[in-house]
Regions:
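A glycine-/small-polar-enriched, mobile loop at the entrance of the PLP active site in fold-type I
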Residues: 1
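Conserved PLP-enzyme active-site core in the AAT-like
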Residues: 5-12, 16-171
Length: 171
């Protein structure tokens, strides 16, 4: 956690596991009964919002935890209005994907501001974003609630490792 500027951190079995844990944490929180209930999300907020240009194969990690993927960014109005309009009582989190080929017309800070206005956490997939080392702290500093990094790739650790960092109540 100290290297990311986050309240808490956890070594996970790869960045994909970090995405699964992000979804589970945002849906079940610290409630032991809800944690054991997953992937059955009955009675829980279970939608993860993802920007249309951020759709990717690793969404299965969120779905494995029981989440439903809801795309935003194809409607009328500004992107900020579209994101705000996509958030509802079933929204567990908004995900933001960083990496080559994943442009976003809203900055992470803008997404965080909109999501937090609705009391919805923002989770970041930063698996491919190391180096530079500055990214270890950037996403938390920009307001993300949870961030996942690959322990392989630029970190040069074992390919089967990852880092999950963020709010203590979600890690």
């Amino acid at each position: 956690a100290q290297y990311t500027g986050a309240e808490a951190g956890l070594v996970v079995a790869g960045a994909s596991t970090g995405l699964l844990v992000q979804a589970a944490a945002c849906m079940a929180g610290q409630d032991p009964d809800r944690i054991l209930q997953l992937p059955d999300t009955a009675g829980m907020k279970d939608e993860i919002l993802i920007y249309k240009k951020h759709r990717f194969g690793f969404e299965i990690c969120y779905r494995t935890a029981g989440a439903k993927i809801k795309e935003w960014g194809r409607g009328e109005g500004s992107l900020a209005e579209q994101l705000a309009g996509a958030i509802n009582e079933d929204t567990a989190a908004v995900t933001y994907v960083f990496g080559p080929g994943f442009p976003c017309d809203l900055s992470l800070r803008e997404v965080v501001a909109i999501a937090h206005e609705h009391e919805v956490p923002v989770v970041v997939d930063g698996a491919a974003m190391l180096p530079p080392a500055d990214n270890l702290t950037k996403y938390i500093a920009d307001g993300a609630d949870l961030v996942t990094f690959s322990g392989g790739k630029g970190v040069r650790g074992p390919q089967s490792t990852g880092i999950l960092a963020g709010r203590a109540d979600l890690v």
